Amino acid sequence: GPFTIELSVGSDTEQIYYTLDGSRPGSGTNLYTVPITIESTTILKARSIGTNTLPGEIMVSTYFINEQSYLPTISLLAEPETLWDEDIGIYENEFKQREIPVTIQYFTPETDHGFTANAGARLGGLNIWTKPQKPFTIYTRNRFGQDFINYQLFENKQIANFSRIVFRNGGDDWEETLIRDPMTESLVSGMMDCGYMAYAPSALFLNGAYWGIHNIREKFDTHYFFENFNVNPDNIDHLEYTSTPSGTQLLVIEGSMDHYNTMINYILSNDLNDLAVYNQIQQWMNVDSFIDHLVMTVYCANTSWGHNREWWRSR
């Protein structure tokens, strides 16, 4: 039910300002004078401001009232105009390349607070960002105050450092179950020699408003390869087939394409029935992993096979 919150500051020369809509508190926002009554799910940002001192750190809290979830809960906070403004809002205008500062608060199904992190957020995906419920890619950066999210997000992976995570909307399965992609990847776990992105469903609140189920996913990046395969992130080639305005292209994410081009040219120029040729290819690539990839693509009727394909190797 409703309750009140009391705020205090240690100096008589400072005052507390607060907001309840996700915006940054400042001298032009609400001045705290009496306890704040909380009657429904609310996000509170508060900071102290004095005449001869630097403004205090912004304190963030999310209060859930009569909200029940059996899933982990994400509270995603951002300046409202960075989301909804008709000129600059990334949600309003479907701006994919614009990155906005956000605060993330994570709560376990038992409502325990897991972590709070300041980060950047962009709309993610190739086409799925056009859905009414959009995916977010989260980027930790030094300028936001931290390089990693230090928390174990996934039960089936003993990893507790993330520089990128994705709050996915279900992708091509958005209108249906939201779980086809993570369910398919769960079949790979422990069974095939393929990298896969871990998955955990969550209930996401955007500036205090319930925003539906979003799947927490890993993201393929240099830190992913370090944590999952214990390889030097500065010494890999990482390539991705993705769609661009000029069509589907193979792009270099990390390293170079030299080794890949050498291998492809060798394959096109030689007879794979020759055992010596095949043995050479096995030295250059993990053939079993590639077979597993093809098996899953066909068996699970992958509808995004024209893109969303990534290769990597440790140099």
Identify what each model region corresponds to.
Residues 1-121, 142, 170:
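Short, compositionally stereotyped local motifs that mark structural "simplifiers"
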Residues 2, 33, 41-43, 60, ...:
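Extracellular structured ligand-interaction cores
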Residues 91-96, 128-129, 301:
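Short consensus segments that form the blades of beta-propeller domains
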Residues 102-111, 179-194:
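Zn2+-dependent metallopeptidase catalytic core
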Residues 136-158:
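Reverse-transcriptase-like RNA-dependent polymerase core
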Residues 151-158, 162-177, 209, 215-302:
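ATP-dependent phospho-/nucleotidyl transfer catalytic cores
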Residues 190-205:
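Short, well-structured beta-strand/strand-turn elements
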Residues 207, 296-315:
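Zinc-dependent metallopeptidase catalytic helix centered on the HExxH motif
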